[in-house]
């Protein structure tokens, strides 16, 4: 390496180095400005909120995306509201092939700054950006079959947004989050329960409204005000563990909430409850030999559950 003394003694060398650095900087600026936005294809990296989980045994559809899953994508001007049409990208379906997400046709950038909005599962025909109807399944015990999602996965609406983006060869990150609420129920054998407790049961969540309206720009689910309260069949995660996706809402009056049916016996728990958006609510249900003496323990909340 040339010392400062040597550089001073050889001003030609120093001047050459300065010119070289300036030349490199000019080339980088030239590359950035020479990017043709309209000829630059969009690419994306997609992250499922459950991707960081390391469970011992969990179905892939609950913790990550699977091959042939589809997300809906909008790309709109950063200084304009998202519209049902007229954006740079309008509800394009991106399909996962097991390694990357690709649209049916190549999507290209344009000049300017944009915001990207994405949701899952994909809805083929949207009717609104601010009030898109959406329903969670009332039978979330069903499993994926062919191209049809299971009841639980079809109910777990995910949303992602990335703002202030422009034409680039770098992929746009889409980090999804849950916008519904989740109730996880763990069945625990009480001290006075005789014999072995069955590893499977029918578990219901009563008196919630399964219909919602979705704001696809804000990523917010709101209970449909004219919706009717219904019962939801929970999904079995493991022995004694069940869960259900619930539209965010408040049950203000005490009423039947959780019912467990095992060996022909019904265990019913009544309560008020607030289902918060993006929150997993954990409850332990203590099963007694006497169905009238069922007890519950609130196990806490997990924000932005994985």
Model-predicted segments: where are they?
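Sec-type signal peptide cleavage vicinity
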Residues: 2-12, 21-306
């Amino acid at each position: 390496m040339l010392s400062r003394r040597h550089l001073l003694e050889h001003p030609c060398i120093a001047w050459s180095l300065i010119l070289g650095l300036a030349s490199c900087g000019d080339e980088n600026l030239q590359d950035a400005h020479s990017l043709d936005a309209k000829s630059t294809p969009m690419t994306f990296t997609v992250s499922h909120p459950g991707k960081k989980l390391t469970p011992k045994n969990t179905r892939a559809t609950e913790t990550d995306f699977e091959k042939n899953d589809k997300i809906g994508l909008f790309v709109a001007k950063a200084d304009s509201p998202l519209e049902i049409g007229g954006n740079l990208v309008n509800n394009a379906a991106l399909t996962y092939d097991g390694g990357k997400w690709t649209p049916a046709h190549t999507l290209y950038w344009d000049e300017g700054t944009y915001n990207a909005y994405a949701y899952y599962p994909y809805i083929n025909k949207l009717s609104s950006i601010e009030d898109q109807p959406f329903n969670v399944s009332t039978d979330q015990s069903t499993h994926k079959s062919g191209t049809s999602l299971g009841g639980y996965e079809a109910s777990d609406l995910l949303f992602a947004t990335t703002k202030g983006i422009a034409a680039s060869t770098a992929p746009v990150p889409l980090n999804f989050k849950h916008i519904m609420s989740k109730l996880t129920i763990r069945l625990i054998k009480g001290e006075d329960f005789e014999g072995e407790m069955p590893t499977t049961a029918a578990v219901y969540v009563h008196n919630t409204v399964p219909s919602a309206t979705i704001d696809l720009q804000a990523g917010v689910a709101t209970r449909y005000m004219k919706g009717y309260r219904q019962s939801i069949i929970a999904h079995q995660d493991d022995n004694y563990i069940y869960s259900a996706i619930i539209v965010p809402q408040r049950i203000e009056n005490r009423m039947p909430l959780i019912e467990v049916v095992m060996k022909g016996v019904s265990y019913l728990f009544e309560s008020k409850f607030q289902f918060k958006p993006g929150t997993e609510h954990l409850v332990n249900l203590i099963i007694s030999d006497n169905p009238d003496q069922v007890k519950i323990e609130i196990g806490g909340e997990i924000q932005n559950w994985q």
